[in-house]
Regions:
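Non-transmembrane alpha-helical segments in soluble domains
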Residues: 177, 186-193, 222, 226, ...
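Extracytoplasmic ligand-binding clamshell segments of periplasmic binding protein
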Residues: 93-96, 192-254
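Hinge/lid segment of periplasmic solute-binding proteins
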Residues: 111-173, 254-257
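Extracytoplasmic/periplasmic substrate-recognition and gating elements
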Residues: 246-308
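Conserved N-terminal structural module of periplasmic/extracytoplasmic solute-binding proteins
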Residues: 1-115
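Structural recognition of the beta-strand scaffold that forms the well-ordered cores
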Residues: 88, 107-111, 163-165, 172-175, ...
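Loop/turn elements at helix/coil->beta-strand transitions in domains of secreted/extracellular proteins
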Residues: 48, 82-85, 104-107, 160, ...
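C-terminal capping/gating helix-and-loop segments adjacent to ligand/active sites or protein-protein/ligand interfaces
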Residues: 66, 301-349
């Protein structure tokens, strides 16, 4: 055996000895591991605890509840994050205002246009529209990564983005066809809009009536219209839904519906408190991204609300909602600003 062969033999012998010495230790560690338990145990989260979500109800959908819709999205987020809990609370504007005056503020807030002034909310930088897998929300063809659709600038406070619109309602004309025809109703609506009546006070009306070539017609409030009084009223999708349910139970007269105009003051926004802790932001961003996803946005149609994601499938069971939201989509740039909208303006709390 020459020198080279002796060297190789020595190296191999050393390797065999090391293997024999350390194999039992390595095998012992592997035998001590419970790999099944490791597989079941969730990954450690950056944050564990409660994320508070308020849904401030400024208007109601045709049917169902936006609060319940948000709760389902929260449940999905909880399943993805062990130890993270979303508490979703639906409250009125008056209840929310009382809480704000008392110094309370949630981590995430869903609010109607004009309820907040913007300074209470965190400045958004686009990371809020990225989902769990790090991909951006799909807003459809024509929108690049992180690019917001037309109309989303209504969440701007000056030059900063502080809220994102996620749903919109509409104004409708409800009328009794035995008292006023659809053609006459169309003429009345034209008269109302041409005389500068704002969309905000369209349902706070007088009973002075409106004249047309065919005669004079009495306009009532939604509540009076439900009792069969007046010839027509201006209401929202919930008013139409309530009337349909009453009519189905033979508790209201047959009525018909036409879109009131191509504008609305019923827009719901989502924002993040300026005081929300940084470690919560990952879960919150995923929650908001899910709200804006095409799949979740399409679900709003079953509530009778218009989704704000252009990629969402817009299918409404009621033809008058299809027509009303079709008109609204054409004037999407006219949505009210989140902080200076038609609803009551409020100072900072």
């Amino acid at each position: 055996m020459n020198g080279f062969q002796k060297t190789i033999a020595a190296v191999l012998l050393a390797a065999v000895l090391l293997f024999m010495i350390y194999l039992p230790k390595c095998a012992g560690k592997m035998l001590e591991r419970d790999q099944y338990r490791e597989w079941l145990e969730p990954e450690e989260e950056e944050f564990s605890g409660v994320i508070n979500v308020w849904h401030v109800v400024g208007f109601k959908p045709y049917m169902g509840s936006v609060g319940a819709w948000l709760k389902k999205i929260a449940d999905r987020a909880e399943r993805r994050h062990f130890g993270v809990y979303f508490e979703v609370e639906s409250i009125s504007e008056a209840e929310a205002e009382a809480k704000l005056q008392n110094g309370e503020f949630p981590d995430v807030i869903s609010f109607p246009a004009g309820f907040l002034n913007g300074r209470e909310l965190r400045i958004m930088n686009g990371t809020e529209i990225f989902g769990i897998d790090g991909t951006v929300v799909d807003f459809g063809d024509g929108y690049g990564a992180g690019e917001l659709p037309a109309g989303f600038d209504c969440g701007m406070d000056g030059r900063t983005l502080r809220a994102l619109p996620f749903a919109a309602g509409c104004k409708l004309a409800l009328f009794y066809p035995e008292r006023v025809t659809a053609a006459e109703m169309t003429e009345i609506l034209k008269h109302i809009t041409e005389n500068g009546e704002s969309k905000a006070d369209a349902d706070s009306c007088s009973n002075d009536g409106f004249g047309t070539e065919a005669g004079k017609f009495e306009r009532s409030s939604v509540d009076e219209f439900k009792k069969g009084k007046g010839d027509f009223c201006i209401g929202d999708a919930r008013a139409a839904g309530d009337m349909e349910r009453l009519a189905a139970a033979n508790k209201a007269k047959y009525f018909e519906v036409l879109p009131f105009c191509n504008e609305t003051d019923e827009v719901q926004f989502v924002g993040i408190s300026a005081k929300t802790e940084r470690e919560k932001m990952g879960c919150i961003s995923e929650f908001i991204a899910d709200m804006l996803s095409a799949a979740r946005q399409s679900e709003l149609c079953t509530l009778g609300l218009m989704p704000m994601n252009p990629a969402a499938e817009k299918k409404f069971e009621q033809s008058f909602l299809t027509e009303a939201y079709g008109l609204l989509s054409e004037s999407i740039l006219n949505l009210p600003n989140a902080f200076t909208g038609a609803a009551a303006r409020r100072a900072a709390f």
